[in-house]
Amino acid sequence: MLEIDNQTPLESDFLLLEKIANVLAPTQIIELILVSGETMREINRDLRGCDYATDVLSFPLEAIPHTPLGSVVINAPLAQTNALKLGHRLEEEIALLFIHGVLHLLGYDHEKDKGEQRQKESELIKIFNLPLSLIERTQDSF
């Protein structure tokens, strides 16, 4: 189940995100929060000590029955900018960020694992017919 807190003027169809949530965590609640760039910078600074606006952050919650799996926070204006720059729809960019964030909630960590998160993202991208994943874009830019 997906709970959405859209704190931006951005209007989007979240049906795809609900489908993704149902595939990744069919029995759990996932909170999606769409924020401005400034709000994302504040969250990143206050909680991670990084004074810049990033595209997506994940905050897992304790594994308590009937409580949310955690929160995925997406920088909506940056998602919009990246979608335009990369030539795909905003909904696709948000879906890519959402997948990336939810996988972190589920315990995947692309900085430490041996490619498991990248592999899972690739599988989901194929299932939902999405463009290049966040990890693949980052690795391809080096």
UniProtKB/Swiss-Prot annotation:
Q: What is its EC number?
A: 3.1.-.-
Q: Record keywords: Transcription included?
A: no
Q: Which residues form a coiled coil?
A: none
Pfam families xrefs: YbeY
Q: Where does Zn(2+) bind?
A: 100, 104, 110
Gene3D superfamilies given in the database record: Metalloproteases ('zincins'), catalytic domain (3.40.390.30)
Q: Which keywords belong to this entry?
A: Cytoplasm, Endonuclease, Hydrolase, Metal-binding, Nuclease, Ribosome biogenesis, rRNA processing, Zinc
Tell me its cofactors: Zn(2+)
Please name the GO terms of the biological process aspect recorded for this protein, alphabetically.
Answer: rRNA processing
Into which family does the record put it?
Belongs to the endoribonuclease YbeY family.
The record, for NCBIfam families, names: rRNA maturation RNase YbeY (TIGR00043)
Q: What does this protein do?
A: Single strand-specific metallo-endoribonuclease involved in late-stage 70S ribosome quality control and in maturation of the 3' terminus of the 16S rRNA.
Protein name from the UniProt record: Endoribonuclease YbeY
Report the gene name: ybeY
